[in-house]
């Protein structure tokens, strides 16, 4: 009986999970797709993601996450990239400051450009 009660409680609690609220108006999402020169190379991917982690300290960033492509047969899905980066900024001014921040330009010049053959950026705001 205790096991049954525990399972029911676990089920009820898991159904109470909520998703995060929408980002505040004025925030900017900076989505960057990377195609590695050596597709799938784990050592290069680690260097790239380490560079991304070093960007977290730049003022104006409210969130930073990255990952790899999810394979898909759907024709509308582009899964040809190796790594995607998502950076959320508090506003457009923070995005523009980031673009010229020496820490960002250093990682781009020393790590990202040497290890990637293509970079595609999408920025959007609310």
Q: What are the functions of these language-model segments?
A:
Residues 1-4:
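Positively charged n-region of N-terminal signal peptides that target proteins for export
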Residues 61, 116-118:
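A generic structural signal for alpha->beta connector loops
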Residues 6-15:
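Bacterial N-terminal signal peptides
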Residues 30, 101-104:
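Histidine-centered active-site/metal-ligand motif
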Residues 43, 47-50, 103, 107, ...:
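Extracytoplasmic/secreted proteins, especially bacterial periplasmic and envelope-associated proteins
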Residues 16-82, 86, 90-96, 124-126:
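Short S/T/G/P-rich N-terminal loop/turn motif that feeds into the first structured element of a domain
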Residues 96-99, 109-116:
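Short, exposed beta-strand-loop hairpins at the edges of beta-sheets
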């Amino acid at each position: 009986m205790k096991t049954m009660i525990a399972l029911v409680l676990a089920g009820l609690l898991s159904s109470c999970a909520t998703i995060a609220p929408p980002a505040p108006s004025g925030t900017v999402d900076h989505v960057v797709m990377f195609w590695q020169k050596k597709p799938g190379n784990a050592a290069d991917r680690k260097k790239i993601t380490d560079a991304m982690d070093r960007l977290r300290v730049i003022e104006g960033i409210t969130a930073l996450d990255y990952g790899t492509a999810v394979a898909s047969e759907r024709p509308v899905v582009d899964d040809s990239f190796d790594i995607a980066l998502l950076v959320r900024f508090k506003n457009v001014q923070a995005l523009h400051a980031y673009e010229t921040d020496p820490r960002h330009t250093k990682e781009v010049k020393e790590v990202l450009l040497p290890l990637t053959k293509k970079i595609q950026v999408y920025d959007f705001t609310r």
